Amino acid sequence: MTIKLIVGLANPGAEYAATRHNAGAWFVDLLAERLRAPLREEAKFFGYTSRVTLGSEDVRLLVPTTFMNLSGKAVAAMASFFRINPDEILVAHDELDLPPGVAKFKLGGGHGGHNGLKDIISKLGNNPNFHRLRIGIGHPGDKNKVVGFVLGKPPVSEQKLIDEAIDEAARCTEMWFTDGLTKATNRLHAFKAQ
């Protein structure tokens, strides 16, 4: 099993760029930078894309330019065009159930109320069996405050922790292609930014 498409979820536009909900895009932006593969807008895939080599694999990067709840449109367009199966996709997204400074890989599962994941599952024919990179952003403590929280900007102290976790996640994603998922997962899951 190899990953052929790495997606970073986000809302488009400058007003959302620094919000917690865009943590997935921060990850893909960093990966593109590390691999010197700038993202370019590609209308037919409804997003910013790039092509990279990881290990010996040809991998596409994607940050949808749709709103979060329509992310599946971009993912399905790219998956269909390049004949990529759900289990060959890694979707990076913000995760309320993990604290800032932590990131974890996961295969399959529900959407946990995340509208981006919900739409991707739906557009992939109700198939949830894609890989996820869950980037911890913490939880406001009250479910009624979640929308304002994910669309808010983290304070500097939390941003630093999130950035460190994303940095480690980028290293571990590269490691996945050279040393395998088990090693990459063990390393990432042992990490906690201080």
Curated annotation (Swiss-Prot):
Keywords of this entry: Cytoplasm, Hydrolase, RNA-binding, tRNA-binding
A single MF term (Gene Ontology): peptidyl-tRNA hydrolase activity
Residue sites binding tRNA per the record: 16, 67, 69, 115
Top enzyme category: hydrolase
Tagged with keyword Cytoplasm: yes
UniProt site (Stabilizes the basic form of H active site to accept a proton): 94
Matches recorded under CDD domains: PTH (cd00462)
Residues under site feature: Discriminates between blocked and unblocked aminoacyl-tRNA: 11
Organism superkingdom: Bacteria
Catalytic residues in the record: 21 (proton acceptor)
Assembly notes: Monomer.
Family membership: Belongs to the PTH family.
The protein, known as: Peptidyl-tRNA hydrolase
Source organism of the structure: Shigella flexneri
